[in-house]
């Protein structure tokens, strides 16, 4: 079995009747899978995001993050057709400014019903990335 954890964060999302996040080490612990599952009774906009100091380049459902000579590849595995975008992570006072910080986003507009967002994060390994993506299974089966 793969090392994994699932957290119920429904109380943080009033628009969802259920909201779960799973994190698993996959592909012989060479990658991390972040998977969110939400039950949304009405259409809403959902944004999956990660904040980083890295330089970020996107290409549809893929992104490469570079920092201090290291690379991390991000790929949206679900839903089909979803794409990444990048925005500034800088904030206004009185918050910490976060100069140079970026946010890698996957935004779903009019999301409704059973919604799954799955993002695979893979460091750049010397022997290259894994050849295939892991199978996406419901969090209840983790």
Where are these regions (language model features)?
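CBM-like, beta-strand-rich accessory domains located in the C-terminal region of large
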Residues: 1-142
């Amino acid at each position: 079995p793969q090392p994994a954890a699932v957290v119920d964060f429904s109380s943080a999302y009033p628009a969802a009747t259920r909201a779960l996040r799973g994190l698993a080490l996959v592909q012989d612990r060479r990658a991390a899978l972040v998977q969110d599952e939400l039950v949304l009774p009405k259409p809403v906009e959902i944004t999956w995001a990660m904040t980083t100091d890295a330089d970020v380049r996107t290409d549809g459902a893929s992104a490469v993050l570079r920092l201090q000579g290291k690379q991390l590849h991000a790929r949206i595995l679900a839903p089909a057709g979803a794409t990444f975008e990048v925005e500034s992570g800088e904030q206004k006072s009185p918050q910490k400014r976060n100069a140079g910080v970026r946010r890698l986003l996957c935004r779903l507009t009019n999301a409704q019903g059973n919604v799954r967002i799955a993002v695979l994060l893979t460091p750049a390994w010397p022997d290259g990335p894994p050849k295939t993506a892991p199978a996406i299974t419901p969090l209840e089966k983790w």
